[in-house]
Amino acid sequence: MEQALLAIAPVRISANVVIPFIPVVAVFIGALVALWRRPGEGLSSAIQHFAAGVVFAAAAAEILPQVKHEGAIVPTAIGGVLGVATMLAIKKLEERWKGPAGMISAIGIDLFVDGVVLGLAFLAGERAGFLLAFALTLEVLFLGLTLTTELAQSISSRVRVLALTVGLALLLPLGSFLATPIGHLPPDWIIGFLAFGLMALLYLVTEELLVEAHEKPDTPLITAMFFVGFLGLLLIEEAL
């Protein structure tokens, strides 16, 4: 496994430089859309369901097999527990922060963690990193919509709102870059970090995207978008 990681390290480093900026572009687009006209609750819920399905598929199809097949029980357990504990701790902090500053801090942490998880995904392979980047792009697109809408209520300048939103989105590639050196650690350490990332992704799907989506009016078509996203990513994976 260690030789395989070293063999593809140059490819991963190159991908880590470019791919993490794709979600930043999505945040920029989401911010522009929100400044012009915020999507309705139905469309927002559909996007969240679809994004949840894509993220879940990326975690199940790319990261889970890597963790499972290595059979490293102790690193998997430690990484998984730390992943869940970290996400719960972040949620607790977000509940204490109020107002625009609290929202900015919470979204900033979410984006940074997403970036770290994206960087970890490349440890499972270039395809895993690409597919997860696609999944996270959909998620942060919605974050861009939400953040811009909230900031526009307290900041009159659209340019400042756009600049602040995009600046915050740069925390995602920063997190991805910081995760890159993990690829040089021993295999058991890498599995532990992959287990950490897997738990973070599952938390994102079950406790953030779907919970927020179900706070809005729901229809069978909107619910079906989760499965459309899941199946769609599986088909893309088979085609690659």
Question: Each predicted region: which residue ranges?
Answer:
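Intrinsically disordered, metal-sensing/regulatory segments
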Residues: 1-240
